[in-house]
C-alpha cells in the first residue's frame, strides 16, 4: 500500500482522497445477546438512509473521504459502508483490527496461535477481503486503555505491526489520552515507520509536552473527538491551537469519533450529544480556531494534505 488505498468501493490513489475526516463510525453495535451486527432487508436500507444523511451533511463542507476504524467486534459492516458510499459519493476506508483487546487476545493465546493468528487475520482482510465481501480493509486499528499497556494489548500491537510491515498498511490507534508514546515505541521497535502511525484520541490530553513527544517522534496526532460531551470543544481547540502555533500543523489530523447509527446506543445530534455530529468541526470548531489565529492553509493541511501524505507513506514535513 502507499501507491493505492483500499476503500469500501475499490482502490484509489492518495491524491484522490481530498478532504478527509480521519476517525468516524458509520455503524456501531457492541456484541452481546441483543447484537444485530449484520442488518438486512428493510432494516439495512433504513440504517443506510440515516447514515447517508450524515454523509451528505459533510459533503456540503467539501469532505470527500471518511476513515471508519470500526472493528469486527464493534459491528463492522463493510457492505453497509459500501452502500453509504454509493448513496453519498463519499470514499469510506474501513479497518481491520480488534477493540476488545484483553478478552480477544487472551482467548486467542489459549486456543493457540496468538500473535501469529491475529496478524494473519489482519493480513487476509487487507489483501484478500473481509469475509466473503471482497471489500478490503485499508488501515489497521489497535487499542490500549490505561494506566499501562497490558500484555494482551502489547500482543495486539505486535500483531498489527507484523501485518503493517507485511502489507504496507498504516495504523490508527485508540488511546485514553495517554500511552501514545508507548504505542509509538512498541510499534516502531517492531518495524513500523512512525509516520505510518496516527495516535488517536490525543485530544483527551491537555498536555502539550505529551503531544510534542509524539510529533517529534514523527507520528501523527489526531484531535478526533470534537463534539463529544466529555470535554468542551473550547478546551480541545485551545490545545490544538497551541500545536498549530508551535508549527506542528503538518502532524495533525481532525475528526469527531461520531457514530452515525449506534444500535441500542445514543442518537447523535440530540441532547447531550447535540454537537457530536460529523459537521461540528466545520460549523463550530473552525470559527473558534480562526478566532485564535488559525488559517485556512492550516485547516487544509490538517484535512487534506496530512491524510494524503499519511496514506501515501510520506514523511511529515
Model regions: which residues?
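Short acidic/histidine-rich active-site segments
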Residues: 174, 224-225, 248-272
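Glycine-enriched alpha-helix->loop->beta-strand junction motifs that scaffold or abut catalytic
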Residues: 89-90, 167-168, 188-196, 213-222, ...
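Mid-to-C-terminal alpha-helical segments outside catalytic/metal-binding sites
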Residues: 2-10, 278-317
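Alpha-helical scaffold segments that flank or form the walls of functional sites
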Residues: 18-91, 116-135
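Active-site gating/metal-coordination segments in enzymes
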Residues: 83-86, 91-166, 220, 225-230
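Divalent metal-coordination and catalytic microenvironments
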Residues: 23, 66, 98, 164, ...
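Active-site glycine- and acidic-residue-rich loops that bind
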Residues: 72, 200-205, 224-243
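Distinct, well-ordered alpha-helical segments
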Residues: 81, 150-155, 178-191, 207-215
